[in-house]
Curated annotation (Swiss-Prot):
Entry keywords, A to Z: Amino-acid biosynthesis, Cytoplasm, Histidine biosynthesis
Listed pathway(s): Amino-acid biosynthesis; L-histidine biosynthesis; L-histidine from 5-phospho-alpha-D-ribose 1-diphosphate: step 1/9
GO biological process, one term: L-histidine biosynthetic process
Record-linked InterPro entries: aa-tRNA-synth_II/BPL/LPL, HisRS-like_core, HisRS/HisZ, HisZ
Compartment annotation: Cytoplasm
Protein task: Required for the first step of histidine biosynthesis. May allow the feedback regulation of ATP phosphoribosyltransferase activity by histidine.
Protein name: ATP phosphoribosyltransferase regulatory subunit
TM annotation in the entry: none
Family classification: Belongs to the class-II aminoacyl-tRNA synthetase family. HisZ subfamily.
Record's signal peptide: none
Subunit structure: Heteromultimer composed of HisG and HisZ subunits.
The keyword Amino-acid biosynthesis is assigned to this record: yes
Organism field: Ectopseudomonas mendocina (strain ymp) (Pseudomonas mendocina)
Length: 395
């Protein structure tokens, strides 16, 4: 092996160096503290599991993004987690088994066999919050509000929120009696706003249903879209009206809470259609090709673990938040340099400073004040008037 190969990392895998690693960790702590203030309890899930557990109830997309290995102890197939959300759903449904609403949050590295896009990391730090046990729009409003405040805490500028509801398309598709294959083809065409394909796939449907399905591709824009949708879908089944009413209620609450937050509605955007069951949402910023955070309702996911539960939540990549945002973090390199000296009073001074929250670096044999700057210190402990005192480090 050539020497150069010994330090090369795989595509999409990166190491994080100081001080960036310190910024990411400080951001993680601040966001988890925010989640805790909202009542969300922190959980830690395994990095690797048997595939049967890891992929139960998950879609093909997660299967393709999961690194797979063979367990040398059991011979069974295992996978490195590519998404923490299903693991947390299992904790709620099978492990905790609480009856009422349950709020859980998490932060941890995940590993992707395939990147989501050409320039994205294959080792993001997934951060998220999930609310289980309540099927009302109040839960969706809470998690979207928590996402907004997470992005505000991270000081990510120029955020706009996209909202949709998979129940609208699903209700129309069922009323039209679309086969699974045609429903998927029409879904794909709607994502691409491919009007010729949409026309062809809906041509044989009753005029009313065909017109309503075709209208989804054009129902995108600001708040006025919801008014247009109520007119365009007036003859839709009750399930569609219920979904639209949920979206209106969520939009009303977000506009009241965050009047400066731009909201964009796209009733043909069916992100996570095979996974989500209700409202879907994503946060975007200018200059980023994809969503920087996303989420939605995914009721009954826990059924595969023995207990169906309403669920809604969101996730994001902590590294992305730190890169895009301007979170107030204590980035200044500060510390106290203690000389290489075994004096008991020096040791007591070092312990006192550390107990007060100071960062103290003790010199090793052969080191001097000249090494203090490289160690991130801006002050030193100096013996003056018979006492060890903190003094500025000479420049």
């Amino acid at each position: 092996m050539a020497t150069v190969d010994r330090w090369l990392l795989p595509d999409g895998i990166e190491e994080v160096l100081p001080p960036e690693a310190a910024r990411i960790e400080a951001a993680r702590r601040q966001v988890l503290d925010l989640f805790q203030r909202w009542g969300y309890e922190f959980v830690v899930t395994p990095h690797i599991e048997y595939l049967e557990s890891l992929l139960t109830g998950a879609g093909q997309d997660l299967d393709l993004r999961t690194f797979k290995v063979t367990d040398p102890l059991s011979g069974r197939q295992m996978g490195f987690r590519a998404d923490i959300t299903p693991q947390v759903a299992r904790i709620d449904a099978h492990t905790l088994r609480r009856e009422g609403p349950n709020r859980l949050c998490y932060a941890g590295s995940v590993l992707h066999a395939q990147p989501r896009a050409l320039t994205t990391s294959r080792s993001p730090i997934q951060l998220g919050a999930e609310l289980y046990g309540d099927a009302s729009p109040a839960s969706d409003i809470e998690v979207i509000s928590l996402l907004v405040e997470t992005l505000e805490l991270a000081a990510v500028p120029d955020v706009h929120m996209d909202l949709g509801h998979v129940g609208i398309y699903r209700g129309l598709a069922r009323a039209a009696g679309l086969s699974g294959e045609v429903e998927q083809q029409l879904f794909d065409a709607l994502q691409r706003k491919a009007m010729d394909e949409i026309e062809a796939l809906t041509a044989a449907l009753p005029a009313g249903l065909g017109n309503m399905l075709r209208s989804l591709a054009e129902l995108c824009g600001g708040r006025e879209v919801l008014d247009l949708a109520q007119a365009a879908l007036v003859e839709a089944p009750d399930a569609v009206h219920a979904a639209l009413d949920e979206l209106v209620a969520i939009a009303d609450a977000l506009e009241l809470r965050y009047p400066e937050l731009p909201l964009y509605f796209d009733l043909g955007e069916l992100r996570g259609y095979n996974y989500h069951t209700g409202v879907v949402f994503a946060a975007f910023v200018p200059g980023e090709g994809g969503a920087i955070a996303q989420g939605g309702r995914y009721d009954d996911t826990g059924a595969v673990f023995g207990r169906a539960r309403p669920a809604t939540g969101f996730s994001t990549d902590l590294k992305t938040l730190v890169t895009l945002g301007d979170m107030r973090l204590d980035e200044a390199v500060r510390g106290v340099w203690a000389p290489d000296n075994h004096d008991l009073y020096l040791w007591q001074a070092v312990r006192r400073l550390r107990s007060e929250g100071e960062r103290v670096v003790q010199a090793l044999p052969g080191q001097s004040e000249a090494d203090a700057r490289e160690a991130g210190c801006d002050r030193l402990l100096a013996l003056r008037d018979g006492r060890w005192q903190v003094a500025p480090l000479a420049s």
